[in-house]
Structures are given as C-alpha cells and as structure tokens.
Design a protein with these regions (language model features):
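Conserved CoA-thioester-binding segment of acyl-CoA-metabolizing enzymes
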Residues: 1-56, 93
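C-terminal capping/lid region of NAD(P)-dependent oxidoreductase domains
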Residues: 49, 206-213, 257-262
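Crotonase-fold acyl-CoA enzyme core
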Residues: 93-209, 232, 236-241, 246-249, ...
Length: 262
C-alpha cells in the first residue's frame, strides 16, 4: 500500500507530510484514511505536543483529486455532500479540537480544500512562492473544508467574498499582508523555520496552549459575557496544572522552566 501520509515523530513534534507529489498532494479516499489514523496517534500520545503539517514536492495540496471521484459529466450527479461529510468535516473538526498547536508549512500551491485546510491550522507559515487558490467557484462548487466559516474570519467579509467568487490566486505575501497567515519565509528556509517553531511549542505548557486555542476559537461566536465566563473557567483549570506550578517556580528561582505539558 502506498504511503500517502509520511509520519515522523521527533522531539515532541509529529510531522505529517502529504505524499502524493505527482498529483500535487490532492486527496483521495486512501489518503484521507491514512491521515485520520495519524491524527488518532496525535490525539492519544501525550509525548506528541505539537503537530506540523506540510506537503511533499512542489505543492502543499491541490484539494480533492477529481480523477479519484470518476465523475461522468453525462452520468448521474455524484453526492458531493456525502464526500464532504465523510472526509473533510471530521478532519477540520479534529484539527480544531486538538488540544495541541497545529502548524502548517505551505510549500507551493494550496488550492481548494488544500487552501482551507492550511488556513484552518493554528499557525501558518508559507514559502514566498506559495499560492492560495479558492478554486471551488471555477467548478461551480461552494468552498468546503470549513472555507465559508473560515474565510470571513481570517480575511474579512469583503476579501472572503472576492476570494470565493473569483477563485483567483492569492500570493503568500498578500495573504500575510491581509493577516491571513503568520509568516512568509524564503522557500529554502521553510522546512527549518517550521520545525524550529514546532519544536519550541513542543517544549511549552501544552495543556495551557490547548486552553488558549479553544478559548480563541470559541471567541468567534461567543458574546463578551460568555467569553469572560469561559476565561474564568479555563484559568481555573490552568491554575491547577503542573506546568503552572513549574512556571511560577522557575520564575521565582530565575531559571528556565521545564514544562511537561500537563
């Protein structure tokens, strides 16, 4: 069986590489299944404290492999909603709920579901040559993989509407200028920059980082009062963590903290 997802764990970081470079790492059913299995390991293994997602070859991900669907323009219409519900929705939900930082290193093109997958990660670093393409409208489709929820939040309504309706390429530099991604780096430094950041996050108070992630995600739909209540509850949990005690002890002793992620 082909390895469509390459998995490597080192220094608390799991690096998952989308590995169908001949198809620009576009998704097929088996690739989805392999990625789901890898995410199970991230969820269950407390020694993995950061997830890094990237692509092999000259692109990050071109979205869904249309050849894999065997669509016959003259035949019965496929149920694309079922495909989205079966594969993409669980993926996006799992990444959003994962109580660990998720970094995406975007090399080359990120198109369709590949673009929304990348932008849905917690921190996005892109190579200078990277391009984001909301290609759905070119096929008469609706942005999926969380795209219609995500785009207005990372780009604002006007830009989200333009990106979705026009389906034009968006450069990494422009995405950074619009605040959609964290950082743009030279192509040759992308892998090292992303790994360095992932390894740093893997040494930090993972439990607290997970609470931060969930709080910020919840703020998108919460009222101020609801969010204040959530901050209170999460701060209570964080204050009971071993990492909080270690952080305070290290501060008072003027030494570097040794967080365990708990």
């Amino acid at each position: 069986m082909m390895e469509f997802i390459l998995s490597h764990v080192e220094k608390g970081v799991m690096t998952l590489t989308l590995n169908r470079p001949e198809r620009l790492n576009s998704f097929n059913d088996e690739m989805h299944a392999q990625l789901a299995e890898c995410l199970k390991q991230v969820e269950r293994d407390d020694t993995i404290r950061c997830l890094l997602l990237t692509g092999a070859g000259r692109g990050f991900c071109a979205g869904q492999d249309l050849n894999d669907r065997n669509v016959d323009p003259t035949g019965p219409a496929p149920d694309l909603g079922m495909s989205v519900e079966r594969f993409y929705h669980p993926l996006i939900r799992r990444l959003a709920k994962l109580p660990k930082p998720v970094i995406c290193a975007v090399n080359g093109v990120a198109a369709g579901a590949g673009a929304t997958l990348a932008l849905g990660c917690d921190i996005v670093i892109a190579a200078r040559s990277a391009k984001f393409v909301m290609a759905f409208s070119k096929l008469g489709l609706v942005p999926d993989c969380g795209g219609t929820w995500l785009l207005p939040r990372v780009a604002g309504r006007a830009r989200a509407m333009g990106l979705a309706l026009l389906g034009n390429q968006l450069s990494a530099e422009q995405a950074h200028e619009w605040g959609m991604i964290w950082q743009v780096v030279d192509d040759e430094t992308l892998a090292d920059t992303a790994q360095q950041l992932a390894r740093h996050l893997a040494t930090q108070p993972t439990f607290g980082l997970g609470l931060i992630k969930q709080a910020i995600n919840s703020a998108e739909t919460n009222t101020l009062d609801t969010q204040l209540d959530l901050e209170r509850d999460y701060q209570r949990l964080a204050g009971r963590s071993a990492d909080y005690r270690e952080g305070v002890s290290a501060f008072l002793a003027k030494r570097s903290p040794q967080f365990t992620g708990k």
